[in-house]
Amino acid sequence: MADFNSPIQYLKEDSRDRTSIGSLEYDENSDTIIPSFAAGLEDFEPIPSPTTTSTSLYSQLTHNMEKIAEEEDINFLHDTREFTSLVPEETDNKPEDDEESGAKPKKKKHLFPKLSSHKSK
């Protein structure tokens, strides 16, 4: 039988690939060996209890997502005044009809004239 009074040492690597010595300690209550850095996590329950079903988890998640969506809608409604200046007026969106007025169509200005100068001649 193993001597559980002395900790078992092992090599461990962290995220920076540094090797250090860790130790395993015996937990008399659970009859398992746990790493010493996990001390205090015995009460942590990451797995849902058996009374929680997947449908209740789904409904809880759906409810939370709807609540977040409602909050975002409210925030969006309050913040729309910031974006009204970005919307052009209707008169700005109408293209000028040069052919009907008899005027010559205007040349389009290039965004980068130096790059497009060899094409426009």
From Swiss-Prot:
Record keywords, A-Z: Acetylation, DNA-binding, Host-virus interaction, Inhibition of host innate immune response by virus, Inhibition of host IRF3 by virus, Inhibition of host RLR pathway by virus, Late protein, Viral immunoevasion, Viral release from host cell, Virion
Region of interest (Disordered), residue spans: 1-24, 84-121
Compartments, as annotated in UniProt: Virion
PTM annotation: Acetylated.
Entry annotated with the keyword ATP-binding: no
One GO cellular component term: virion component
Modified-residue entries (N-acetylalanine), positions: A2
Main location: virion
Inducing factors: Expressed in the late phase of the viral replicative cycle.
Domain of life: Viruses
Composition bias type Basic residues, residue spans: 104-121
Disulfide pattern: none
An annotated Gene Ontology molecular function: DNA binding
GO biological process, one term: symbiont-mediated suppression of host cytoplasmic pattern recognition receptor signaling pathway via inhibition of IRF3 activity
Known role: Structural protein required for transport of intracellular particles from the assembly sites to the plasma membrane. Binds to both ssDNA and dsDNA. Suppressed the activation of the cGAS/STING pathway by interfering with the recruitment of IRF3 to TBK1, which in turn suppresses IRF3 phosphorylation, decreasing interferon production.
Quaternary structure (record): Interacts with the major capsid protein. Interacts with host IRF3; this interaction interferes with the recruitment of IRF3 to TBK1.
Family: Belongs to the asfivirus structural protein p14.5 family.
Protein name in UniProt: Structural protein p14.5
Lineage, uppermost ranks: Viruses, Varidnaviria, Bamfordvirae, Nucleocytoviricota, Pokkesviricetes
